[in-house]
Amino acid sequence: MKNLLITIIVASYNSKDYILETLESCINQQYQNIEIIIVDDCSSDNSVELIKQWCKEKKSTSPKIRCILVESERNKGIPANLNNALPFINGDWIKCIGSDDILLPEAISEFVNRLEKCSNLDNIGAVFTYFQTFGYSVNVSTRYPSSWTRTICQMPPSWLKKAAAMIHFNN
């Protein structure tokens, strides 16, 4: 099971202030059998240029990790933007994150370790920590804002098996 390829899809839109930190958190995983697909939803800031430069640098420093950028021709919103990644996925499992999200270094290795104990799953939910940074201080919230309640119930942060994703999103 340790040979699973994990695809991390990063949904990006006008994310110049956060995207590099997000991408670094993806590539700095303890589990290294990953590919990173960034889907940009027609950003109007310089996000795309930053992403292209980052991918170019990582090709030389981390050549085993595939990193590609998929650019949308027009802004279509998050679901359609994520769907743009489907033709490029090679991984056995998919992790979708936003361009302002951070993966802890052990996130993928813990997932793969847990999957070894329960290998017949198609979807795995997860919890997350909501935080905001203001200068040098970090305020961590253990309670979800009430405006997120509906979103959390509908689509918790999760891992999705590639086969299940292809069946669900292509029908």
Q: What do the PLM-derived regions correspond to, one by one?
A:
Residues M1-N171:
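Nucleotide-sugar donor-binding/catalytic module of glycosyltransferases
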